Design a protein with these regions (language model features):
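Primarily the active-site beta-strand->alpha-helix module of PP2C/PPM metal-dependent phosphatases
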Residues: 1-6
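Long, positively charged amphipathic alpha-helical accessory segments at protein N-termini or as interdomain linkers
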Residues: 7-38, 48-156
Length: 156
């Protein structure tokens, strides 16, 4: 699924580099309210237990934020998992778009996200083709992480 949001409609306190966290969290929020146990791995991957079930990509094109979501609803490749609840795709989209329309601030979303950030400790991410352990990184208020003194933003 993909959609576009005007940059003017984004929360004023949202750094564009952290949009993938913002939009991923809004979808995660919908799914956990429907009793899914998924969580958000920094910066934009959906996980169930230790396996990836999807992800979010954001990109600025002109004056719009383009968001693309992939989520294993029914089938998944080997080594991945499916969503742990059954939901109609149209209903999921309806609930997700309503959550986007609520226009939560970055501060509201981030305050919830940082409470679960500890779940990243056994995982890693990549920046400039370098694997970075998330075990000892420091999450910053703008959604970036500090690893070995270097600030890293989600570039997805």
């Amino acid at each position: 699924m993909s959609f576009a949001v005007s940059l003017d409609e984004l929360p004023k306190d949202l750094k564009l580099e952290s949009a993938s966290i913002y939009f991923s969290w809004l979808l995660k929020d919908v799914l956990t309210n429907l009793n899914s146990s998924l969580w958000l791995k920094w910066p934009n991957d959906f996980y169930l237990e230790g396996a990836k079930i999807g992800g979010m990509i954001t990109n600025i094109v002109g004056d719009s934020m383009i968001c693309g979501v992939g989520l294993n609803l029914i089938n998944s490749p080997e080594g991945f998992k499916n969503l742990d609840i059954v939901i109609n795709r149209e209903k999921l989209l309806e609930l997700y778009y309503k959550n986007i329309e609520n226009k939560l601030s970055w501060k509201q979303v981030f305050s919830k996200y940082k409470l679960e950030f500890h779940r990243n400790q056994n995982f890693s991410t990549h920046s400039d083709n370098v694997k970075i352990s998330l075990k000892n990184v420091e999450l910053q208020n703008d959604g970036s992480i500090i690893s070995n003194g270097e600030r890293i933003y989600s570039l997805r």
